[in-house]
C-alpha cells in the first residue's frame, strides 16, 4: 500500500514534501496525459484543480525552479508592493493593495494564513489604473512579533503579529505628508526604523524609535530627514527609495533614483526631456541624529561616511546588503533610460562593480541561506541594451551570486516588482499580477497565469536546491 501525493492536502505539505514531488512531476507528465496528473502540484480554487508552475516562468534548466504557487483569496492581484520574510516565524508578508491589507503566507507548508486589514487599499486614477502615490499598503519590514507597514495616507502602521486581525494594528503614526509611506528598513536589533515618503516633493525619510523585542508598542517618530536642495531639487518629482541597514558600518543606505549635477549639466526634469542624471546613495548615521527633530543630508563626506554618494550609470530603486558589506542596487531605466546594468557597491570603500545583462529592478533581496541576490526586475531588457521604453522591457527574476555574477533570469508576469526569500528554507517568493483581461494594468503575457495556474494572480514560490548545486560543483571541480 502506498500514499499518492494527490491525496495529500495542500495544508499537510511541508517543504520536504514539495521537494519530493518536484522531480516526480516531470516524469509523470511524460507517462500520463490524463487530468489526474495535475493533482501532483495543484491548488484548489472554487473546487477546481489547477496546474501550477507551467510555461515560460517554470523552466526546467535553471538552478532556481518554480515549486508551487500560493493563491490569495479575495480580489485579483492588480496592485501590490513590497514583500518581506521573517524566517524565524516562517512567515512571508505581501503589501497587497488589491485587498487593502498585508497577506501572510506560511513559508513552512506554503499555505495562505490571513490578510491583515486596515489599509487604504488601491486608489484609482480616472482611467482605472492605480495611483501608487496614495495607495497602500506599500513598504513592509518585520522584526520578531512586530510588523511595520507604510500606508497611502502617509501613516506608518505598527502590527502585532501575535494579535488577531481585529486588534493587530497597535499604532498608526503620521509622518506629516500627504502621500504614501513607502519603503523602509530596520536595524538588526529592531530598535530603529527608517521609512521614506518617496512621493512627497521634496521627498523625505523619517527615523523612528521602533519596538525591538518588546511586548508592547511604543513606536515614536524621532527625526525628519531631507536631502539638500542642490542634490535633490524640489518641484521636479524626484524621489527617495529603498533603505537598507548595514550592521558593520552602522549606517542606513538609501537609494536615490536621480540627483542633480551627476554628471554636470545633466537633465533631472522629466518634463524637459529624457532624464540624463544618474542617481545616488544616501548614507545616514542614526547616532548623529539623537535629539535632532529635522536634518538635511548633504554631499558625501568620507570622513564621517555620511551624505549622498553620486553613482555612475545607475538610477537605483531597490537596495540590499549582501556579503562583505556589499550593497546591491536595483538600477532601472524607469529612472534613467540609459541604465543597462545592476550595481554592487561596498559600504566601506565605495568601490563598485556593474553586473551586466540584468537591469530594471525594484525590490532586491540578499538571501544569506544560499548567498545569492534575487532581483524583481520588471523592466529588464528583452534583447539588447539600452531599453528605454516599456515595449523593449520584460519582467524577470534575476539570480546573482555573492561574487556579483549573474547566474540566470526567469520570466515573470509583467509588472512583477517584488521579491523576498526565506533564508532557512531557501525559498524565493515572487508575487504575480492577474492578467490584463481580468484587471486594468495587469499581466500582458501568459507567464503569470502559467505560474499561478489561475487568472487571479498569486505568489509564485521558487526553490534553490543548494545541496544539489554544491554536489554538482564538487563533481565537476577538477574536470
Region annotations inferred by a language model:
Residues 23-38:
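Sec-dependent N-terminal signal peptides
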Residues 12, 16, 20, 44, ...:
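Intrinsically disordered, low-complexity polyampholyte segments enriched for Lys and acidic residues
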Residues 49-479:
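Predominantly soluble domains enriched in secretory-pathway, periplasmic, or organellar proteins
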Residues 1-26:
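N-terminal secretory signal peptides that target proteins for export/translocation
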Residues 2-5, 38, 472:
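Aromatic (phenylalanine/tyrosine) cluster motif
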Residues 38-48:
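C-terminal segment of classical bacterial N-terminal signal peptides
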